[in-house]
Amino acid sequence: MTLNRRKYLTGMLALGLGLSLASAAHAITVKDDQGELTLDKVPTRIVALEFSFVDALANVGISPVGVADDNQPSRVIQPVRDLIRPWTSVGTRSQPNMESIAALKPDLIIADSSRHRAAYGQLSKIAPVLLLNSRYGSYNDILKQDQTIGDVVGKSTEMQARISQLQAKVKDIAKEIPDGQTAMYGSSRENTLDVHTQGTFAGSLLAALGFKVPQAEGG
């Protein structure tokens, strides 16, 4: 075997080892509402089935290729739209379109454990699914989920920095609110009124700001 051939083979082996080590370095296992999810590389084609997931991705400079935007791109608020590239609509959050999702060839789908659990089997045939509790998550739940998303997309440090900024802002606002104030957040539809207690995102955020927030019955 010639010296040049030995150098070539040695180089190819080193390259192969380097790629294997790089792949292993990107491998990650995270806990979600389905148990655990393991990915062997950082996903680059992500479909987000809730607005909060789009928000989390945008905060660390990641643009999803597909969004369940209820067929109305404007449902994604302007400050978030300003941070991401145009996406393909994959239907509504309550009924995402499986064909539209599959056509995008995603390498990760981020879904809600309440709204999309029944569709988990179908979704997981398309791509790995990260199942998180966005719809009924509290303020602290959402922060933890955002960090999980940051970990999965290889932006752990950036996400922690964004979360720290938000927590600092909440503390600053809380200092301006007099002690002993009570607050309740409600949302209304044509025939219903929903009250957001401490266990909800809005209610728990108000509590983090220092307000007294009613608990749910039995809570």
Label each residue range with its predicted role:
Residues 36, 118-190:
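Extracytoplasmic substrate-binding proteins
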Residues 38-42, 82-89, 161, 209-219:
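A local structural motif
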Residues 43-64, 140-146, 163-164, 187-190, ...:
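N-terminal hydrophobic signal/anchor transmembrane helix of membrane proteins
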Residues 51-100:
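A short, structured surface patch at a secondary-structure boundary
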Residues 52-55, 70-73, 108, 115-117, ...:
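Solvent-exposed loop/turn segments at secondary-structure junctions
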Residues 71, 75, 195-219:
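Alpha-helical, coiled-coil/dimerization segments enriched in small aliphatic residues
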Residues 100, 105-111, 128:
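Proline-aspartate-enriched helix->loop->beta-strand connector
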